[in-house]
Design a protein with these regions (language model features):
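Short, P/G- and charge-enriched loop/turn segments at secondary-structure junctions
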Residues: 57-59, 89-92, 494, 524-529
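Functional-site microenvironments in short loops/helix caps that host divalent-cation chemistry
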Residues: 33-50, 71, 78, 83, ...
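Bacterial N-terminal signal peptides that target proteins for export
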Residues: 4-17
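Catalytic loop of the DD-peptidase/beta-lactamase superfamily, centered on the K-T-G motif
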Residues: 518, 523-526, 531, 536, ...
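A short glycine-rich, aromatic-capped structural motif
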Residues: 61-154, 167-190, 353, 537-538, ...
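Sec-dependent N-terminal signal peptides
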Residues: 14-21, 31
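Short, low-structural-confidence N-terminal segments
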Residues: 47-56, 62-63, 67-70
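C-terminal motif of bacterial Sec signal peptides marking the signal peptidase cleavage site
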Residues: 26-28
Length: 558
C-alpha cells in the first residue's frame, strides 16, 4: 500500500515538471520569433526579406567615432563663473544646464589640417579661373593678423600658416564664417571616405573630382543620383552601388554608416567639455568645483615630475610670454604645438590657453535659462532645401553659386557646387506651431521687437519704425561694399550704443596673448563673425546619436 502511494505521488510530481518543460519550450520557440530583430514588432512582417519590403540596418551597434574626435558623455553642470567677476561684465552669471553626449576634437584644428582644406579647394576650384577665384581666396586665413605697428612679426606673417615647422600648431587668422565652412567641408570628406571604404563609392572616386562633380553628404542622402554631378551612376559608383538589374544601391540614413555633421561646438558644449567635471565626481556628486580644466586652483602643476610648470600656454605677466631662456614656464612665446600640455579629464588638449576658440553661439550678455536649460544655444536659423520648378531639390552648380560679401569686404562662397541650395523655412513650416514661429531665432527674446521697451502688443511685430531707436542693441551697421573708399565704407553715426548684433559670435578660452583670468572656461568674449585675429582658432564637435554612452555601466569615479 505504501509503495503504491509513493509511486502515485512520484507520478503526480512528474506531471507539472513535464508541463513546465513543455511551457518553457513553447515560450522559447515563441520568444524567438517575437524577439527576432528581423521581425517587425508592428506587423509581424519580415524585415530585410530577400523578396523585398522594408529594409533596415538591424545590426547597427554604435556610432562610429569620426577622425580626430573624442566622446564627451553629457550631463548636468553649472554653466558660468566660479570666481570673482573682476571685469564686472556680469555676462556669465551661473545657471544650471544640461548637455547631451557629443563628440569633440581632441585638439584645435591645426595648420596642417587647414592646409589640406585649402589644397582641396585649389585643386577642385582653380583660383585662376574667374568664376572660382573667390572660393579659394575666401577660405584663406588672414596672415596679416600677426602684424602690429610696434612689433617685428613679419616672420609669422610669412611662415606661420604654411611652413612645416608650424604644421601641428593651431590655425589662426580664421574668422567664424571660415570656421563654419571648414566644418561643412570636413563633414563631406569624412563621409566620402566612409562610403568609399564600405563599397558605395569607387575607391578612387574622391580623387577624380572637379568643379562639376563634387561629393556632398546632403545631396547623397536626398538626391543620390545627382552626386558627383550624376557621375555616381557610372565610374564613381562602388561595388555595392551596382545592384541587380542595373539598379543603383545607395547608403541611406537608415544604413547608419554616415556620420552627423562636423560643426562648431555650442558655448554650453565647449564649457562643459573644458571643465571636465568627471574628474572630481564621486558617484552622483561633485567633490568641489573646478576653476580650470585641471584639478587645481592654480595654474602650475602639482605633479612631482612636472611640479612648478605651467599647465597651459598664456601670458605670464607684462612683457613675459614664456619665462626665461633655458627655463621656459610654458614652452612657448606665441602658440605651441597641440598636445604640448596634458589633456583634461575628457581627454581634450588645450582647453585652456594656446588659442581661444570660436563657438557657434551668437553673443548676448544673458543666458535665458527660463526658456532653455537643455542643449542651450543661441543662433538657430532654420533652413530647408530649395525646390525648383520641376519639383526637384536644387543642386548648386558652378553657374548658380552665390557669394556673400562680409562687412569687411571679404567675399566668401555661400555654398559650394554639388551642395543642395537652401532657403529659410516659411509659414508652411511654422503655421500653428508652438515650439518656433520664425526661421531666424538669433535675437529670440533678446533683441527682437517683442523684447524691446518700445513693444506694446503683437501688432507692433509687423510695424515699421526707426531701426536706430527701436532696436535693443543699437550696433554699427557698415554699408555694403561697393560705393566709397575703394568699395568699403564705415558707419560714421554717433547714435550707436552697442557692438552687439546678430552677427557677433562668442569665443571661449584663453590664449597665448591672455592673462590667467581668461583661461577659466566660464569666461566669455565676443567679436563680429567676420573678424580674424592671431589668438583665435577653433575645433569641431559632432552630435552623438543613440545611447548616452558606449557602456551602460556606472562607475564610482570619472
Amino acid at each position: 500500500m505504501l509503495t503504491s502511494v509513493f509511486t502515485m505521488k512520484r507520478s503526480l510530481l512528474k506531471v507539472p515538471v513535464c508541463l513546465a518543460l513543455t511551457g518553457l519550450l513553447l515560450v522559447g520557440c515563441g520568444g524567438k520569433s517575437k524577439g527576432d530583430k528581423n521581425i517587425s514588432s508592428a506587423t509581424g512582417w519580415k524585415i530585410n526579406a530577400k523578396e523585398g519590403g522594408f529594409q533596415y540596418n538591424t545590426d547597427f551597434k554604435d556610432q562610429e567615432t569620426g577622425p580626430g574626435l573624442v566622446l564627451i558623455e553629457g550631463g548636468t553642470f553649472t554653466m558660468g563663473q566660479v570666481q570673482d567677476n573682476v571685469m564686472h561684465d556680469w555676462n556669465n552669471v551661473p545657471t544650471q544646464q544640461h548637455v547631451q553626449s557629443f563628440y569633440m576634437d581632441e585638439t584645435e584644428v591645426t595648420n596642417k589640417m587647414y592646409m589640406e582644406y585649402l589644397d582641396w579647394l585649389k585643386r577642385v576650384f582653380p583660383p585662376e579661373e574667374e568664376q572660382y577665384k573667390n572660393i579659394y581666396k575666401g577660405a584663406l586665413p588672414d596672415t596679416l593678423v600677426w602684424r602690429s605697428p610696434l612689433s617685428a612679426n613679419e616672420a609669422m606673417v610669412a611662415n606661420y600658416l604654411r611652413h612645416p615647422a608650424f604644421a601641428e600648431y593651431p590655425v589662426v587668422g580664421v574668422n567664424w564664417v571660415q570656421a563654419v565652412q571648414f566644418s561643412a567641408w570636413r563633414t563631406d570628406r569624412v563621409n566620402e571616405a566612409i562610403l568609399s571604404r564600405d563599397g558605395y563609392l569607387a575607391k578612387d572616386a574622391r580623387y577624380q573630382v572637379d568643379a562639376t562633380s563634387t561629393f556632398s553628404t546632403d545631396t547623397y542622402l536626398n538626391t543620390p543620383s545627382q552626386t558627383y554631378g550624376g557621375k555616381i551612376q557610372g565610374e564613381m559608383g562602388g561595388k555595392k552601388a551596382s545592384g541587380k538589374d542595373g539598379q543603383m544601391t545607395y547608403a541611406k540614413q537608415t544604413s547608419g554608416i554616415l556620420l552627423p555633421e562636423y560643426r562648431l561646438p555650442t558655448e554650453a558644449e565647449w564649457e562643459y567639455a573644458a571643465k571636465s567635471l568627471n574628474g572630481i565626481r564621486q558617484y552622483n556628486s561633485l567633490q568641489g568645483r573646478k576653476k580650470y580644466p585641471w584639478n587645481s586652483q592654480y595654474t602650475r602643476s602639482t605633479e612631482r615630475r612636472t611640479r612648478g610648470e605651467q599647465m597651459a600656454n598664456f601670458k605670464q605677466g607684462k612683457g613675459d610670454y614664456g619665462g626665461l631662456a633655458g627655463w621656459s614656464d610654458d614652452k612657448g612665446d606665441i602658440t605651441v604645438a597641440v598636445k604640448t600640455y596634458p589633456p583634461n579629464d575628457f581627454g581634450l588638449y588645450d582647453m585652456a590657453g594656446n588659442v581661444a576658440e570660436w563657438v557657434a553661439d551668437v553673443y548676448r550678455p544673458i543666458l535665458d535659462d527660463e526658456v532653455s536649460d537643455f542643449n542651450y544655444y543661441r543662433g538657430n536659423v532654420y533652413m530647408k532645401h530649395a525646390i525648383g520648378e520641376d519639383g526637384k531639390q536644387v543642386v548648386v552648380t558652378p553657374e548658380t553659386i552665390k557669394y556673400d560679401t562680409l562687412s569687411n569686404g571679404k567675399i566668401v562662397a555661400r555654398n559650394l557646387p554639388g551642395n543642395l541650395a537652401t532657403v529659410p523655412v516659411d509659414s508652411s513650416e511654422t503655421y500653428l506651431r508652438y515650439n518656433f514661429t520664425h526661421s531666424d531665432n538669433r535675437s529670440y527674446n533678446d533683441g527682437d521687437k517683442a523684447s524691446t521697451r518700445k513693444f506694446r502688443n503683437q501688432n507692433d511685430l509687423g510695424s515699421s519704425g526707426s531701426e536706430y531707436t527701436n532696436s535693443m542693441y543699437n550696433a554699427p551697421k557698415p554699408k555694403k561694399p561697393g560705393t566709397e573708399l575703394n568699395g568699403k565704407d564705415y558707419d560714421t553715426s554717433n547714435d550707436r550704443t552697442s557692438l552687439i548684433d546678430d552677427e557677433v559670435r562668442v569665443f571661449k578660452g584663453g590664449s597665448w596673448r591672455d592673462r590667467a583670468f581668461w583661461i577659466d572656461p566660464a569666461q566669455r568674449r565676443y567679436l563680429p563673425q567676420y573678424i580674424a585675429t592671431d589668438y583665435i582658432g577653433f575645433r569641431n564637435a559632432m552630435s552623438r546619436v543613440g545611447s548616452k554612452s558606449k557602456t551602460n555601466h556606472r562607475t564610482p569615479r570619472g
